[in-house]
Amino acid sequence: MKLTLWTYEGPPHVGAMRVATGMTGLHYVLHAPQGDTYADLLFTMIERRGKRPPVSYTTFQARDLGSDTAEVFQQACRDAYERFQPQAIMVGASCTAELIQDDTGGLADALSLPVPVVHLELPSYQRKENFGADESFLQICRKLAKPTERTAQVSCNILGPTALGFRHRDDVTEITQLLNAMGIAVNVVAPMGSSPADIARLGAAHFNVLLYPETAESAARWAEKTLKQPYTKVVPIGVGATRDFIAEVAKLAGVEPKADESRLRQPWWSASVDSTYLTGKRVFLFGDATHVIAAARIARDEVGFEVVGMGCYNREYARPLRAAAKDYGLEALITDDYLEVEEAIQALAPELILGTQMERHIAKRLGIPCAVISAPVHVQDFPARYSPQMGFEGANVIFDTWIHPLTMGLEEHLLTMFREDFEFHDEAGPSHHGGKAVPASAPRAEATADEGSTPEEAVPPVAAEATSGEIVWLSDAEKELKKIPFFVRGKARRNTEKFAAEKGLTRISIETLYEAKAHYAR
């Protein structure tokens, strides 16, 4: 355990909350102290849900630890059933409550409530949020789903969408439309939008569509074994992946692999003349493994970017991500420490970052364009408009989202040609972003030589005064540095300063800049 300002995943009980909140007719009783009762904020503020999540807390306090916390939990279960009358109850403990080792499942069973009780045992100090969601959905399926007669029409279940998921609402709509167009009915969407009664009829479908492996792969594997339902392995993010998904679904359903591509614009937008400036742009990707693997394929094969780095924070999927990274000649970064991610980005100096909300913060600090491709996300990534990531419309949305942060081709040429112009300068940012442009810095006045000194003895102008041996840049070197493209300028500055420090120099001139360039080019 370590202290951090940011975490990509919460503890496992947050994953359980995401499953419970996405469902209807299910109530989650969480054994937790007062400090762990923050679910309302997560779902009502960030996701803008119009109702509170179906979660009740025991909210035990310090004084309860000297008495019977088991009774506190059982009373919370009774109250939750009497007040909400759910079809099923899910019980578990938060990371803090796990320390007192109350048997929440046994305590709930002892009440003999007239509804099914789903037990959760989530190892809070070994696993995290996505595992919690995956395990919770698995236990719900084990408890409620039974083999049953198949539907007359070929049908499938859509598995994986949860509350607080990245564009899950719109992805479900897009994929449902795609499946219906192929003549395949959707039996149940779960966990989001389903009730315990719906879970009970999961077995009626002929196969399962697994949209989000992080939150439903265990349930899909269980259904394959217990309910004899195969499941899809392709996640339909991007044009190529969506076409592969259609072919896979058609094979499972025994239908023709047909799809309406009339709304698909991404391939032409990517190939049009105005998009030639995208070719070869260096991009770094980080997020959950599913979205990163899909995004890397889009970036290289469909948009023409160069993938220079990729990684994920969920260690459960480190193996498939490492395998995918090898296809790009890369070593995957597997970490849940945002500082390591920031170091990797600084070292690679990409032109675009595709990541989570944290990478958006990193990009802002480093002055690099960024687009969000994966949870965790903040409130602005739960848009009011229809904005899927999956299917053909998702491919259109992805193209617009990724391209928007970049400076367009013509403007890049203007920046190169008129670098000191009042309108086209590096600090102004892309003109299509709106907001007030930062005025170009006024040219620094060059220092004059001391009286009586000859031109040869004149001291070159200094960009900043040195203090206590600090390395400073002379104005001519600073001006030369600005000729380097802005997306690699930071790396050039760091390398030059490192070179100067190794040589014992306190002032960097043009000569130092080019010596450093030659040194690191070897």
Swiss-Prot record:
4Fe-4S found in the keyword field: yes
UniProt keyword ATP-binding present: yes
Cofactor note: Binds 1 [4Fe-4S] cluster per heterodimer. The cluster is bound at the heterodimer interface by residues from both subunits.
Compositionally biased tracts (Low complexity): 455-464
CC cofactor: [4Fe-4S] cluster
Pathway in which the depicted protein is active: Porphyrin-containing compound metabolism; bacteriochlorophyll biosynthesis (light-independent)
Record keywords: 4Fe-4S, ATP-binding, Bacteriochlorophyll biosynthesis, Chlorophyll biosynthesis, Iron, Iron-sulfur, Metal-binding, Nucleotide-binding, Oxidoreductase, Photosynthesis
Active-site residue list: D274 (proton donor)
Disulfide linkage: none
GO molecular function, one term: 4 iron, 4 sulfur cluster binding
Summary of the function given for this chain in its UniProt record: Component of the dark-operative protochlorophyllide reductase (DPOR) that uses Mg-ATP and reduced ferredoxin to reduce ring D of protochlorophyllide (Pchlide) to form chlorophyllide a (Chlide). This reaction is light-independent. The NB-protein (BchN-BchB) is the catalytic component of the complex.
Quaternary structure (record): Protochlorophyllide reductase is composed of three subunits; BchL, BchN and BchB. Forms a heterotetramer of two BchB and two BchN subunits.
Protein name: Light-independent protochlorophyllide reductase subunit B
Organism per entry: Cereibacter sphaeroides (strain ATCC 17025 / ATH 2.4.3)
Lineage: Bacteria, Pseudomonadati, Pseudomonadota, Alphaproteobacteria, Rhodobacterales
Gene: bchB
